[in-house]
Amino acid sequence: MHNAAPITRRKSTRIYVGKVPVGDGAPIAVQSMTNTRTTDVEATVNQIKALERVGVDIVRVSVPTMDAAEAFKLIKQQVNVPLVADIHFDYRIALKVAEYGVDCLRINPGNIGNEERIRSVVDCARYYNIPIRIGVNGGSLEKDIQEKYGEPTPEALLESAMRHVDILDRLNFDQFKVSVKASDVFLAVQSYRLLAARIDQPLHLGITEAGGARSGAVKSAIGLGLLLSEGIGDTLRISLAADPVEEVKVGFDILKSLRIRARGINFIACPTCSRQEFDVIGTVNALEQRLEDLITPMDVSIIGCVVNGPGEALVSTIGVTGGHNKSGFYEDGVRQRERFDNEQMIDQLEAKIRAKASMMDESQRITVNLVDK
């Protein structure tokens, strides 16, 4: 029920990764990356399908060898989500996966080789109508840039990116996006700001090697949150030393928190104190697990007492305010006569949320049908 965020998106050109639009005002796409051995086709396919179930838009797959390229061909045949091939060192692998139907090629300027090799990749991408991501990383800058700057700096990352943007410009190839990732939040943020001011292409955001599930999520939320709030960014990936499924969940949570893109339930819950009238923490944890399958955007407030509960419920799709034995229930900001038994809170609230989601989905379907006529 909250209004969309007052964020003006940076204007950019548009490309397509498979059927997913990127840039020029398209919804910010959430990306992840497999961490299986690509040659283990079954494990990789299973992981990609798990990512699909939580709503991933694009998946990157590392293709380090020709054997992995052959495996990639089989993987591509078994999944629906667009796949980006992550290519380092051997440009010939890019040519092979292009032949096998890859949806985007990620190349690293720090190790892909000279301009002739890049030309070969570009010619192949043009032939198969495949976009490219220039993926600059603070940990693998070109040797001459490392020597020039001494350490990764925003200017160093920008120079690496612009060197390869200029090559693609000379080759008259404009179907690309760019990233300038670093593990340091401030380094990454400033690098992206500099790049956003220089080019019109879409930008892929990320804090590389951010860390484990908790610390990595915090770093990514700070860094990407800063950039997204400034309108910078067209796709994103949360890099975690964790299950890739968690990357997708955190990515959507960041977009949801900034009200840039809504998917699923935005839970608003108090941290609890001695005034709580029911188990708020247990209720929220249980509902987050039970309702992971819902994609209908809605705000659900779960507040343990009457101090802030009514106010939060007024601006929520579904709201609960703790009371003695029974708690108040709100729908679309209106207090209902029905009250929830505190001992049955989880089951009752789940039923109400699912019913509301079904109504909202049906309403949207009817609207679409009327427009089509």
From Swiss-Prot:
Q: How is the cofactor bound?
A: Binds 1 [4Fe-4S] cluster.
Mind listing the GO biological process terms from this record? Answer: isopentenyl diphosphate biosynthetic process, methylerythritol 4-phosphate pathway; terpenoid biosynthetic process
Its pathway is: Isoprenoid biosynthesis; isopentenyl diphosphate biosynthesis via DXP pathway; isopentenyl diphosphate from 1-deoxy-D-xylulose 5-phosphate: step 5/6
Q: Which cysteines are joined by disulfide bonds?
A: none
The UniProt record lists the EC number as 1.17.7.3
Cofactors? [4Fe-4S] cluster
For the protein in the UniProt heading, the enzyme class is: oxidoreductase
Could you tell me what this protein does? Answer: Converts 2C-methyl-D-erythritol 2,4-cyclodiphosphate (ME-2,4cPP) into 1-hydroxy-2-methyl-2-(E)-butenyl 4-diphosphate.
Please state what the protein is called: 4-hydroxy-3-methylbut-2-en-1-yl diphosphate synthase (flavodoxin)
